[in-house]
């Protein structure tokens, strides 16, 4: 076994040397809420070449169960999107352990306010934003693209969005996921978690409903087109993706739920930007359509 260690070490070094270096932000740790709280900062990645005309902006919200995650955990996405000529913004938000859900919504709205006001400095178009996120960040992205109230508090409107791409979230319809998760746990003989969706979303049924993106879907208020990505083999996210798709399409809003095969909750996110990745192909097709309008 010892004789293999030098070979394994050499392989690891070679692999690390071949792996692309993460793209450095054009501007890092930008405060967006007038505070010194690191959780209320964002990173901006500008396109390598100055665009001939204002570029679309990809606004990304990290996952982490609303109580973890970091704006730097973006894998391939900054390089992938800036190579396409887009501006890429990745935001932090305060955690649910210190901040209620409605104030997390407000954090994202403030971050969008900063992005809208400063996008042009990086070659971006403040009125051509596509909001995206993974897991809990996907729930936040969908909510901000559907319920206009957090944006309105910042003097913004849904018209700033050209599209929304939530990636593998299970909380677009909070009462429904609580019901399904409870049934799954009972069937498996598992206890309820001490700090689950009930607690994260305010502990009251009326808040579970209000914090659900599906509750606020309505025609005629400017909700952008949606591409809803999910792991086709997951326990909860397929049902939630289809619920959101159905809520949108029944109101005449463009939406497509795409279930990726042979993936996981983490992989569907980290693979975004890889050649021949099915979810990436869907994203590129979606962007081509919505940004042409």
Task: Please provide the spans of the model-predicted regions.
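Bacterial N-terminal signal peptides
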Residues: 3-14
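Alpha/beta-hydrolase superfamily serine-hydrolase fold, recognizing
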Residues: 17-293
């Amino acid at each position: 076994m010892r004789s293999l260690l030098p070979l394994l070490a050499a392989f690891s070094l070679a692999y690390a040397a071949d792996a692309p270096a993460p793209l450095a932000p054009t501007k890092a740790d930008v405060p967006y809420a007038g505070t010194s709280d690191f959780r209320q900062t964002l990173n901006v990645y500008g396109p390598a070449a100055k665009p001939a005309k204002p570029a679309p902006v990809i606004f990304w919200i990290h996952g982490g169960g609303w109580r973890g995650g970091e704006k730097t955990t973006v894998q391939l996405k900054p390089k992938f999107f800036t190579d396409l000529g887009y501006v890429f913004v990745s935001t932090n938000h305060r955690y649910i352990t210190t901040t209620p859900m409605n104030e997390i919504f407000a954090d994202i709205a403030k971050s969008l306010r900063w992005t809208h006001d400063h996008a042009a400095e990086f070659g971006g178009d403040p009125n051509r934003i596509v909001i995206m996120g993974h897991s809990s960040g996907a729930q936040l992205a969908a909510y901000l693209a559907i319920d206009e109230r957090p944006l309105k508090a910042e003097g913004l409107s849904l018209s700033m969005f050209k599209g929304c791409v939530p990636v593998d979230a299970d909380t677009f319809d909070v009462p429904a996921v609580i019901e399904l998760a409870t049934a799954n746990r009972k069937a498996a003989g598992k206890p309820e978690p001490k700090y689950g969706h009930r607690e994260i979303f305010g502990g009251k049924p009326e808040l579970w409903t209000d914090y659900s993106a599906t509750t606020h879907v309505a025609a005629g208020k400017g909700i952008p087109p949606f591409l809803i990505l999910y792991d086709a083999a997951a326990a909860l996210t397929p049902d939630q993706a289809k619920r959101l798709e159905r809520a949108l399409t029944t109101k005449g809003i463009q939406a497509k739920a795409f279930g990726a095969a042979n993936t996981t909750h983490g992989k569907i996110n980290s693979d975004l930007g890889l050649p021949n990745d099915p979810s990436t192909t869907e994203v590129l097709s979606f962007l081509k359509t919505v940004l042409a309008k």
